[in-house]
């Protein structure tokens, strides 16, 4: 029997009215449903699966119910296995989760009929290196951020690209963003907007103590190294705004293109239409 995974945002009361009929609809169309632990609480007699274990069960595709944050978490869990994601917006912004709830079933019909465009999004792979050893490895759909933690002190950074020193500065932080992440934290820090298909990453400083430092766009083939220097004990590594690790002076964060991409089942709206509708881009009033 074909299987589909359902992953949802925790503590979302309206899911009690969404998930049971969704399970019934999928069953009528020949699908067995794998629920993550957040979704299973809305279905009687079902024990949910840890999100990290869903990929090993090889569902045909995954339905994500929530906002952009839910999608980011789900992407890190299922993208390595090449599982396509249909993201249904239950959040506030919904920049990535572009399918409205009222269009969920009609979009699912298109997915089942293999008539739904597949949009591949580049991911970042990130290694945290301490004392010459890889301490942790991560993947990210939006961004890798090194910034100050609780104490309001500037942190020093050395940035290299492909083994060549580029610059150092003191700042609140530095962002390495994918094209998808260019409309997230990097945008708020003054970084450029990249179309999702652009083969590039961007390095965006956060409040640098300088009159000259600007965001830099590099090819996706580049390897980006960030070494934490002064006040390193006040620095923190964050992946997609969700997973974090305190840093020490001398820690190195190495970012490169991940071996896998996120496959999004989408309605194929114009990227610039989404910018206008979600971020009010280009509006004069």
UniProtKB/Swiss-Prot annotation:
Native source species: Koribacter versatilis (strain Ellin345)
Locations listed in the record: Cytoplasm
InterPro entries recorded: ATP-NAD_kinase_N (IPR017438), ATP-NAD_kinase_PpnK-typ_C (IPR017437), NAD/diacylglycerol_kinase_sf (IPR016064), NADK (IPR002504)
Keyword Cell wall biogenesis/degradation set for record: no
Main enzyme class: transferase
One example of a Gene Ontology biological process annotation: NAD metabolic process
UniProt: NAD(+) binding residues: 68-69, 142-143, 153, 170, 172, 242
Cofactor: a divalent metal cation
Family of the protein in this entry: Belongs to the NAD kinase family.
Task of the protein: Involved in the regulation of the intracellular balance of NAD and NADP, and is a key enzyme in the biosynthesis of NADP. Catalyzes specifically the phosphorylation on 2'-hydroxyl of the adenosine moiety of NAD to yield NADP.
GO terms of molecular function: ATP binding; metal ion binding; NAD binding; NAD+ kinase activity
Any one Gene Ontology cellular component term annotated for this protein: cytoplasm
EC code: 2.7.1.23
Principal place of residence: cytoplasm
List of catalytic residues: 68
Keywords (A to Z) from UniProt: ATP-binding, Cytoplasm, Kinase, NAD, NADP, Nucleotide-binding, Transferase
Protein name: NAD kinase
Catalysis performed (reactions): NAD(+) + ATP = ADP + NADP(+) + H(+)
UniProt gene name: nadK
